[in-house]
Amino acid sequence: MPLPFRTAAIGSTNPAKVEAVRRILGQLAPACAVEPIDVPSGIGAMPLGEEAVRAGANARARAALERSGADVAFGLEGGAILEAGDAWLTGHVVAVTRDGRLGEAAWGRMLLPHVAAERLRGGEELGDIIDDLFAKKESKRQAGAIGILTEGAMSRTDAFAYLVAMACAPFLHPEMYGASAPANARRRRLGPRRVAHRGSP
């Protein structure tokens, strides 16, 4: 059964993120119009740590919902986890409906090259690092680090599309997840905290 949404907002104008939402809603809500909205993540251009990435996705979704008349809004955020001497790529999607329901999904981790880990620790943004290492331009708006490192086997859009689909599960099966307002109940836990970042569409 298709989702009942007629309008959806996405808290980004990044083409890779916008296409991920359009791809999945094209399957789950074919009549839904998607509006990209440029909103701040509140956690800077290079979120570091799972909590920061999650907070950024949440902030994007809520800001997009507030700035639009959409039935549902999506926040997509990518970032890195620094652990010991390694850096891991990760991502998070938050979806919030006009009536207060919440959907969420997160990536597993992808190990980044050690040279990228060193430069992330030095304060650089991953997109800039990847562009420099592979002689690309604005890769984060296209295939992304995932697409480049996997030689196109999976793009940034592909990875985010999986998360968008999974974040829609509570809306597809409200009887299983509960149709009351979990977004309100969990707002405090999801909201921005003091998270590590270095000050992306």
Predicted regions and their residues:
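SAM-dependent methyltransferases
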Residues: 1-6, 174-201
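N-terminal polybasic phosphate/anion-binding patch
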Residues: 1-70
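Residues at secondary-structure transition points
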Residues: 17, 81-85, 197-200
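Anionic-ligand binding patches
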Residues: 46-189
